[in-house]
Structure formats: C-alpha cells, structure tokens
Amino acid sequence: MSAALRFDNIGKVFPGVRALDGISFDVHAGEVHGLMGENGAGKSTLLKILGGEYQPDAGSVLVDGRPVQFANAAASIAAGIAVIHQELQYVPDLTVAENLLLGRLPNAFGWVKKREAKRYVRERLAEMGVDLDPDARLGRLSIAQRQMVEICKALMRNARVIALDEPTSSLSHRETEVLFKLVDDLRAQGRALIYISHRMDEIYRLCDACTIFRDGRKIASHDALADVPRERLVAEMVGREIADIYHYAPRTLGDVRFSAEGVDGPALREPASFSVRAGEIVGFFGLVGAGRSELMRLVYGADRRRAGALTLDGKRIDVKRTGDAIRHGIVLCPEDRKEEGIIAIASVAENINISCRRHSLRAGLFINGKTESETADRFIQRLKIKTPNRRQKIRFLSGGNQQKAILSRWLAEPDLKVVILDEPTRGIDVGAKHEIYDVIYRLAERGCAIVMVSSELPEVLGVSDRIVVMREGRIAGELPRADANEHAVLNLALPQTSAVEAA
C-alpha cells in the first residue's frame, strides 16, 4: 500500500547550518505518526517544507505516491495539507469566525454574510466539541484559546494530511482531551497525521508509529511504537541516557528575600500573598485560567495592581512598571517568549547582552563590542545554545535555544535578586529541559529567589522547594516539597465540583 505522505531524502541548508540531511519516512492513511527530537533537530523545518514555507534543497515530498512541489502555503493547502505550527498564525483584530474562514468568508456582491458565517462556525465548533465564541476577537483570547482556533481552522478545511507541532503546549487538561478525541476521530476517518510533541505520555497515547530526529538526521523509525520502551526513545533523541531529568539537590535557604502581600487585580478573585526565600525555588501550579501568569504580571509591574505591597530584603519597594522591577533586580521570563521574551530582529549576542547594555548606558559608558562578543560566546558555550554563531538572528533558533538565550541574559545580570519564570520549558525537549533546570539551580545557588510558573505537574514536583497552588483566580494553598505529590496538588488545583469527574 502506498503511503499517503512520503518524505524521500529531504535536505535543507541554511547559512552555516545543515537543518535536514537525508530525511526519509512514510506516513499512512489512518495513522498518527509521531515526530520526536531535541529542539533544533529539524522537526519544525520539515513541517515548514510540507507547508510550503520552505523549499527543500534535496529530495522530494510525495502525496499519494505523486511528487509535489509547494511554492507557497496556498499550494500546500490546495493539495489537502494542513500544518499547525507552534508559532500561531492569526489576525488579532478579527473575530474567531473571521479567522476560521479567512479567505473563504461567504459573500454576496462583495458584502460578507456575517450572520451566515457565524452560524456555520458555531455549528462546526459544536461538532468538534470546542467551546469558543465566534464573535470574540483573537487578540483578546488566551494563548490556549488561540491555539484551539488554529487547530479548528485546519480541521474545517477537511485536509487529508494534518501536521500538528506541539499542539497541547498551551492547552488545559480539558482542552487537551478535546484535542485527543479530535485526533482519534481523524485517524478513524482515514486521515494521515504527523504529531510533534516532547511529552512522552501524548506520543504513546496518540501515535501508532514514531520517527526520531537528532541534529537534522533521522536516527530511527518505529512502526510499532507501543513495543518501544520510553528509555530507548529518550536515548535516541538526546544521544545519551538521562536517568533523572530534574536532578534536584537540597540547598541551604536564606531569609525571606521577596514577599507580595494582598496583591489584587482584575484577573484575580481575591488578593494574593506569597513569599520566597533567598535560594528558594517556589513552583506555582494551577490549571489554565487559574490566574498564575496574571498574578506574576501584577507583581512585575506589567499590569496595574489595584492593591498590594511588595517587599524586597525586608524593605518596601514601589513597582508601578516593569522598569521599576528591573531596577530592583526583579526580572520576568514571560510565557510567550516569541512576543515578549526575545527581540526577533536582533542577533543572539544582542539578545543575551540586553541587560549589560542597560547597565553601560545608565553609567554613561560606551557599549563595548568586544566585551559583548565575549559574553555572548561564553554563554553560548556554557548553556549549549545551538547557533551557527553569535550573529545569527535569534528568530531562527529553536524554542529551547531561544529560552536559553533569554536565561543567559539574566545570568549576566550582576544585581539579580528575584527571577520569575513563566512556563520556562513549554515546548522544549527533554535534553534542553535538563539544561534549563541546571540554569535555574545555578540562579538559586547564587541566592536568587526563584518563582517558577508551570503547567507540567511532574516539573513542579521535581524542581520546587515549595509549591503554591492557584485555583480560579485565588491561591488555594501551598505544600512543602516533603508533603507534595500529584494527588495533593491536584486536590488543591481542581475545582471542587469537578474533582471527582477529573479523577
């Protein structure tokens, strides 16, 4: 039986980097084919070739046994292919309905039939079990809701081949289950699916087969994934055994370094209070919509507080905007690193040196290009940032390497006291996670107070000294590491009316 989709000896080269080297594998109708590998292994590059964004330098793509060449994304869509990238593609000022039907809006004599469009979208969303308001503007939705819109857009095009790149990275448990049901239904309909994820549970739950990438090459393909041990997949991905990804070690903690008392804002149901000691890692866990990120933005001065007091090393501080927080040695690595964490048009070196430049300019000093280059090279080597050189634009790096560059920025900060990390390993492979945890521990050993917001419960349990749990806009409780386990944390995180159902 011929494959619904075949990659035959695909090669792709960028300046200084061989992104793909001789990639070949098949995806069959009625099959979910997992694609795994470290960040920068070439998975997303392959999907961009499939989606018509890039053209291969070698090899060919075959759909139903016929060679195809996609000059652009429109040609790929016309061939019945839908690619849902990790970097979402939408128009923020348009509604859900308008985004879903972009380029296909029903019209008469040049006038869009909005009522007909909304009715059609509402019916299709109901069929897929997705709860979204067709009139809501995309720019006002959460990242999780925007991701569901992208997934629904592909499904509404009735594509025969669907590729999903980290589709659950921002979804809640309930939204993830909706997606899993959609994937199962699509497989039953005979669609061919490619599924990229760093989450082993998802790969084993959804995928029939799996291909492993490393450094742009195919390491292995497994036609019967259920028979392959997880440890083997991890070793194939990273090229080494990782016995304990979290490698937590107890530290001596200092006095309370930072505290927030009675912090309140529009996204919170009640004022929130918490504290962090010097050298302590406090994990914040909660379901999507619990208010964790919103609380951190209030503390950091990114959003206006209605009330609340902040204390640093026993002294009250005034933080009304992000610049105030940074001057006090408080920094935030945001959840949406593409929009808020990196300067996409700048180089890796420039992104790493932002903190150093601020100190130089404040002191009235000239920017020292040689020092900046040495700093960038030191952190590129120290954090194993995969880039052809320091001058590479950071937008061309994988998510994990972008995140390591952001963390390098703050490692270079001499006056750092409080580090807030919002989903620091979202969409990042197991090897890069291991390295990012090293950075977090290094910051804690320097005496920094660390706040880590994460939706991955094993991560929170594995890295944190103490866990604060939020539920529906309020702090539901906290647990010391010794008393924390999945049951105890979820018991605090789940709405009480849904605890039995979710269990």
From Swiss-Prot:
Its main location: membrane. One of its GO terms (molecular function) is ATP hydrolysis activity. Belongs to the ABC transporter superfamily. Arabinose importer (TC 3.A.1.2.2) family. ATP binds at G37, E38, N39, G40, A41, G42, K43, S44. Keywords: ATP-binding, Cell inner membrane, Cell membrane, Membrane, Nucleotide-binding, Repeat, Sugar transport, Translocase, Transport. This is Arabinose import ATP-binding protein AraG 1. The gene is araG1. It is found in: Cell inner membrane. It is a peripheral membrane protein.
